[in-house]
Amino acid sequence: MTDNARARKLADRIQVVVAETLDRRIKDPRLGFVTITDARVTGDLREATVFYTVYGDDEERAASAAALESAKGVLRSEVGRQTGVRFTPTLAFVPDALPDNARTIEDLLDKARAKDAEVRQVSTGAQYAGDADPYRKPEDEDEETDGSSEKNEGPASA
């Protein structure tokens, strides 16, 4: 079995090789603005999953996916030539869900900001319930300052 460090290094190298090959050698007009975001290799180094994103609408994504599938053989041979491993891993291209997840998170954050602004606007003229000074003051302070001389004189005269 191979260690995870070797698989990680091979995955990083596959990502770079596929991105460079798509940029330099693949001239398919269906291939749009494709970005290779990640690559993962199984523990036995036989299969590699390459994640990609495409800038554009669903039609351009489908066309780019078809172009990647048709260029899979050229990309695999280039990966085998540049990595020098005994068995060249088979490539599987998967659209990355990262942009969709990021868009969902941004929408949720926008909703939270809108609700915060709404609460802030509602609470601008509000006052807290209860007194302005909610703390109790000891009653002994008032009595000591008013009758402190009487207490001292009282027991002495009796």
Curated annotation (Swiss-Prot):
Biased amino acid composition, Basic and acidic residues: 148-158
Q: Name one GO biological process term.
A: maturation of SSU-rRNA
Q: Where does this protein reside within or beyond the cell?
A: Cytoplasm
- Iron: is it a keyword of this entry? no
Region Disordered: start-end pairs = 114-158
Cited SUPFAM superfamilies: Ribosome-binding factor A, RbfA (SSF89919)
What highest taxon heads this organism's lineage?
Answer: Bacteria
> Which InterPro entries does the annotation name?
KH_dom-like_a/b, RbfA, RbfA_dom_sf, Ribosome-bd_factorA_CS
Any GO molecular function: ribosomal small subunit binding
- Coiled-coil positions are none
Q: Which UniProt keywords apply?
A: Cytoplasm, Ribosome biogenesis
Q: Quote a single Gene Ontology cellular component term.
A: cytosol
Question: What does the subunit comment say?
Answer: Monomer. Binds 30S ribosomal subunits, but not 50S ribosomal subunits or 70S ribosomes.
Task: Give the family per the record.
Answer: Belongs to the RbfA family.
Q: What does this protein do?
A: One of several proteins that assist in the late maturation steps of the functional core of the 30S ribosomal subunit. Associates with free 30S ribosomal subunits (but not with 30S subunits that are part of 70S ribosomes or polysomes). Required for efficient processing of 16S rRNA. May interact with the 5'-terminal helix region of 16S rRNA.
Q: Which NCBIfam families match?
A: rbfA (TIGR00082)
What name is this protein filed under? Ribosome-binding factor A
